[in-house]
Amino acid sequence: MSDAALSSRPAASDTPDAPALPLGTSDEGGLVSGAAPSEAPPPGELVEPGRALALADFAPPSINAGERLIRLAYRLGIPGSTLAAPLRKAAKPRLLATVGNPLPGSKMAGTALRAGHFLVHGVKSPIAQIDFAGAARMAPPLERVVHSFSWLADLEACAPREAVASVAERIMGAWLSANPKPPSRPGKGPAWMVGNAGARELNWLVHAPLILSGSDRVLRAKVLTALGETARWLDKNVGRAEDLLAEVAGWCGIVAAGLLLPDGKPRRLFGEAGLIRALGELVGDDGGVLSRSPLGQIEAIALLVRLRACYQAVRRDPPLALEAIMGLLVPPLLALTHGDGSLGSWQGSWAMDAQELAALVEASGVRTRPLRDVRQWGYQRVVAQKGILQFDAAPPPLAKHARTGCASTLAFEFSHAGQRLVVNCGGAACAGGLIPIRLEQGLRATAAHSTLVLDDANSTAVLIGGKIGSGVSEVDLDRRTLIGEKNAGATRIEASHNGYVSRFGLTHRRILILRDDGTELRGEDLLVPAGRKGKTGKVGFAIRFHLGPGVEVGLSEDGQGAGLALGDGSYWQFRIGGEGQLAIEESLWADGQGRPQPIQQLVIQGLVSRGGGSFAWLLKKMG
């Protein structure tokens, strides 16, 4: 076993100002050890979302001295068959149990597969034209679907097994012919990235009846051989994963193989310790993944849900630490849902449908409330009756954690009664579907989010490959409750970032005040000189408010406001404080399937002195 598989990485104001917008009356090295695992709440029990992580949450399961020796020997490269049964021949390849699929796929995508196409984010790609060897690179979303075999869940969802098994076997045979042997290490094409290989091993095991129930004995033997070879490849290469989430996927594949393939106990012990360590590095103190991406949060939950199904198939309880971590992952994700249960558009995600999210949360077995203040993950959530405000109050993720990192600091989304009024464009992660790949970097830019932009520059540099460069490094945050009479109280959030200081000498500060009845959102965007000697001259600014789908907008006669008509028949008014010009521009929004939808945006724009400026605005429900 390679050194990489044995290596470990290190873990990853006193007196607030008065409101600027006052409201009127209107064991071994490399494995986490040293603490007993904490008890996880039983499935279905309401979890308190504010509970902080304890060291015990990331402790490997308690094992005896003999099992510790087995785990150490396996890490050193002694075959599992030798450790599990040293006095007999290695067992023949077979599966020890059948796994029940805990997460149904897309019937529409499965139907497309039966018709001969992969359907990914609205684009049909003929199976016959897919290069399974990976010499000709595909769009990233299609590449992930093809090589992770996540499409098996879609196929299983669309028809009885006997009706779709032949399709699965045909694609499986083509993939195995193009990938007969694993390479020595990752990097030999997308099929052998650790994230794809780990997810593929897990999906093969969860959906094994689709690819092993046919009459073709030669294919069956090839599939069983591929299961074993992929597991051994992951044993050696999981430490070379492209990022932490990919490493977690690799460890999940290892543990699943240890549970369901013969002589797997040494691999399972090795994999459980590695998985819990990797999760400890992936997840922050409040349960949010360090990429700050809700899609990353969803992927981590889905991996653990499928892995738990493998434990259930062999009638073995998963480690308590895995259940505890599952309970920590769900509340931050729910903080980014709107009133209709669908997802906000953050860090490259699209507005995932409520039904899909609800199915994931139900499968997790975690009953909990959304976190209100996910401060370390970087998001604030305010619920005011039917109004929901989501606010990005943190720097973008570090480059090593980002997959589709976005320069979205101080952006917000706002919905009322399930109707989205203000959104972010989203969709960078699904670029390559109906959203052209050339728009990927633009959808990650500051201008694609509902916040202030200076001189058309990003508050944090947006780099290729989903990475993030220099820019915002500090965000100050203050949140408080304002007491008022007759439901006139409010929640006030004030935050500032330094992303424009080095270029323009200005700090962006944003104040948002949402009334407790959810019908009025006041805002103020301030540009404050960062030093005693401010720079001279003026710089262009634009404060963008991307409007939700179905919102009809028209400017007022004085040019200082706009009327917003929503699909539910309600009417809202937007007003500005006199500084800047208000305009309507075209925009784009990624819907629940990752498809582009045309929307509009309100833009306050003009020139501001390097000495600073203040721009107030109001969004109010009129009827």
Model-derived regions, located:
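Short, solvent-exposed loop/turn segments at the edges of secondary structure
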Residues: 249, 407-409, 447
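Extreme N-terminal leader/anchor segments
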Residues: 2-127
